[in-house]
Amino acid sequence: MTNKELVLKFYDEVFNNWDISNLDNYMKDNYIQHNPTAPSGKEGFVEFTKFFFSLKPHMDIIHIGEDGDIVYVFFKCTLENGAINKVCDIYRIEDGKLAEHWDVVEHNVQDIVPVHNNRLF
């Protein structure tokens, strides 16, 4: 499985099906998290999902790319309450598992009135 395929499978199973039962297949125990609002480690990710899954998120992947051990994912994250977030996640893969994560999030883009005619996604 390529690194990109690993991340696609992770998004489908974990984020879109809200299922962390196979997390050991995707994530290293010492997963490094760079988002300041989420704890590091696999157990930290499990804690994060308790809140995040309560929002009933759905990710629609717009772009995904792979460069060596780095995979980036640009996606639309729609929450049950109607909020739409524009997100770019970046992962470092090590030994076939997610080892490190960075992200950039633009929250509530449904409320933004663009000053241009370009699409947001």
Predicted regions and their residues:
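C-terminal and inter-domain tail/linker signature
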Residues: 1-121
